[in-house]
């Protein structure tokens, strides 16, 4: 069995976790108490959803997940919410005092008190697996727990489970909507620490999701519930191939193989289509060609950046629902001729395709329409460097005046870590720049460099 363990860190991670597990349960027909009427093999079995759920002898399905937060309020909502019976109480781990938006608290002072407990719980989950495939880590860049504790956890997971892949779903701080002044600090510190430990990181930018909710779903003032339900659809599309049997299934390691050309350049851009409200869906036929084309619209991306300014290094299309390979090939052929999609010259224009016959499910009473087919595109493009540049610029503005730095130093960090992290980010921007440069011109000087 190829199991995956999901780890939800901090408020953002936990709330996205709630949305994701709610959706998974609906997709698999699992009730909030963990019973699954459709499941014929009690207490085990080798169904594909067992990658995400373990089964007890009583026929209860328990998510292979850990929820961690350094303060109790958010996870208390899970403990009292609709799905309280779904999770094992030990899977919900809370501390006493929060990280106060401070990376240093999440990583050093408060985080280190709880890390061993968390790893212990993860070990228990891992021991139940026959062939653990890897970890999915959900967190935000801006929060103290999401940035600091996640980077600590990733370092420790690399030590304990060296060869297992670690994928991140990271909430990138929105350019306009900010929940904390120090988000740029936390984001850059966590990216620097996690860069060498993460195999692939899907970034989601709150502002991009806000815009999609406003524009496509006509929600004037989107709440976090709206955002998380949309994010959970994307996560579900990416993980569908692990949870269902499909025609062209995609494994966790397969994502990395196809999307990550160099270890550091592992930030694919996710795009999902169709995002459409019920009243509109009734009047539109959403063919494979249409939804595939929608994926190349910058408006449907999960991070604000413009792929038309960048070059694609790899592209992966994950379809679900009523889709046949013939339609997909036709759609891709059309896009290759019509769209001005620039690939880097060292990469042939390959599109990796996954098809899953399970149609998308929507949360009843939610904003999204039930559609026959959907697609999630994961593309590795040099344009995402724009997002890093934005963040680095904000970091520089504050750090030039050393604003707020004393809070971090007071928690046992050294100022050198800031400059070290910033240099690493500058190197990352440079890496993206070099990857996009055509290889023919720079042949002479490139020879000496090792990759």
From Swiss-Prot:
Induction: Autoregulated by feedback control of mRNA degradation. In excess of soluble tubulin, TTC5/STRAP cofactor triggers cotranslation degradation of tubulin mRNA. Mg(2+) binds at residue 71. The modification 3'-nitrotyrosine is found at residues 282, 451. CDD domains: alpha_tubulin. The active site is at 254. SUPFAM superfamilies: Tubulin C-terminal domain-like (SSF55307), Tubulin nucleotide-binding domain-like (SSF52490). Keywords: Acetylation, Cytoplasm, Cytoskeleton, GTP-binding, Hydrolase, Isopeptide bond, Methylation, Microtubule, Nitration, Nucleotide-binding, Phosphoprotein, Ubl conjugation. Its cofactor is Mg(2+). GTP binds at residues 10-12, 15, 71, 99, 140, 143-146, 179, 183, 206, 224, 228, 252. Some glutamate residues at the C-terminus are polyglutamylated, resulting in polyglutamate chains on the gamma-carboxyl group. Polyglutamylation plays a key role in microtubule severing by spastin (SPAST). SPAST preferentially recognizes and acts on microtubules decorated with short polyglutamate tails: severing activity by SPAST increases as the number of glutamates per tubulin rises from one to eight, but decreases beyond this glutamylation threshold. Glutamylation is also involved in cilia motility. Its EC number is 3.6.5.-. The modification N6-acetyllysine is found at residue 40. It holds the Pfam family Tubulin_C. The modification Omega-N-methylarginine is found at residue 339. A motif (MREC motif) lies at residues 1-4. GO terms for molecular function: double-stranded RNA binding; GTP binding; GTPase activity; structural constituent of cytoskeleton; structural molecule activity; ubiquitin protein ligase binding. One of its GO terms (cellular component) is cilium. InterPro entries: Alpha_tubulin (IPR002452), Tub_FtsZ_C (IPR008280), Tubulin (IPR000217), Tubulin/FtsZ-like_C (IPR037103), Tubulin/FtsZ_2-layer-sand-dom (IPR018316), Tubulin/FtsZ_GTPase_sf (IPR036525), Tubulin_C (IPR023123), Tubulin_CS (IPR017975). The modification N6,N6,N6-trimethyllysine is found at residue 40. Residues 432-451 are annotated as: Disordered. It catalyses: GTP + H2O = GDP + phosphate + H(+). Belongs to the tubulin family. Heterodimer of alpha- and beta-tubulin. A typical microtubule is a hollow water-filled tube with an outer diameter of 25 nm and an inner diameter of 15 nM. Alpha-beta heterodimers associate head-to-tail to form protofilaments running lengthwise along the microtubule wall with the beta-tubulin subunit facing the microtubule plus end conferring a structural polarity. Microtubules usually have 13 protofilaments but different protofilament numbers can be found in some organisms and specialized cells. This is Tubulin alpha-1B chain. It comes from Homo sapiens (Human). The lineage of its organism: Eukaryota, Metazoa, Chordata, Craniata, Vertebrata. The gene is TUBA1B.
């Amino acid at each position: 069995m190829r199991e995956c363990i999901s780890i939800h860190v901090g408020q953002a991670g936990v709330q996205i976790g709630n949305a994701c597990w709610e959706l998974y349960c609906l997709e698999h027909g699992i009730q909030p108490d963990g019973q699954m009427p459709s499941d014929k093999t009690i207490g085990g079995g080798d169904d594909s959803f067992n990658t995400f759920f373990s089964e007890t002898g009583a026929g209860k399905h328990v998510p292979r997940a850990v929820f961690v937060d350094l303060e109790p309020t958010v996870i208390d909502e899970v403990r009292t919410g609709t799905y309280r019976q779904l999770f094992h109480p030990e899977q919900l781990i809370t501390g006493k005092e929060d990280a106060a938006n401070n990376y240093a608290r999440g990583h050093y002072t408060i985080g280190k008190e709880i890390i061993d407990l968390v790893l212990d719980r993860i070990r228990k989950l891992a021991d139940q697996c026959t062939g653990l495939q890897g970890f999915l880590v959900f967190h935000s860049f801006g929060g103290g727990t999401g940035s600091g504790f996640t980077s600590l956890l990733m370092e420790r997971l690399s030590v304990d489970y060296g060869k297992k892949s670690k994928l991140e779903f990271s909430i990138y701080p929105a350019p306009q909507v900010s929940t904390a002044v120090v988000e740029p600090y936390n984001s850059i510190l966590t990216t620097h620490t996690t860069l060498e430990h993460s195999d692939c990181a899907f970034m989601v930018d709150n502002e991009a999701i806000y815009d999609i909710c406003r524009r496509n779903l006509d929600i004037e003032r989107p709440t976090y519930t709206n955002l998380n339900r949309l994010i959970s659809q994307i996560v579900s599309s990416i993980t569908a191939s692990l949870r269902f049997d499909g025609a062209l299934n995609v494994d966790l390691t397969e994502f990395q193989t196809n999307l990550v050309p160099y270890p550091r350049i592992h930030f694919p851009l996710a795009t999902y289509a169709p995002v459409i409200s019920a009243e509109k869906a009734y009047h539109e036929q959403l063919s494979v060609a249409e939804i595939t084309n929608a994926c190349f619209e910058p408006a449907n991306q999960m991070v604000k950046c413009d792929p038309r300014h960048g070059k694609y290094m790899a592209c992966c299309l994950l379809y679900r629902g009523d889709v046949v390979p013939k339609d997909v090939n036709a759609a891709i052929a059309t896009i290759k001729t019509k769209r001005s999609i620039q690939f880097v010259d060292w990469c042939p224009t390959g599109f990796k395709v996954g098809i899953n016959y399970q149609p998308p499910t929507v949360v009843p009473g939610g904003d999204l329409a039930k559609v026959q087919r959907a697609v999630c595109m994961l593309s590795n493009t040099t344009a995402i460097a724009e997002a890093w540049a934005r963040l680095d610029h904000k970091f520089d503005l504050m750090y030039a005046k050393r604003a707020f730095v004393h809070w971090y130093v007071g928690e046992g960090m050294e100022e050198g870590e800031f400059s070290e992290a910033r240099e690493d980010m500058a190197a990352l921007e440079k890496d993206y720049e070099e990857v996009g440069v055509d290889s023919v011109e720079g042949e002479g000087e490139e020879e000496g460099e090792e990759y």
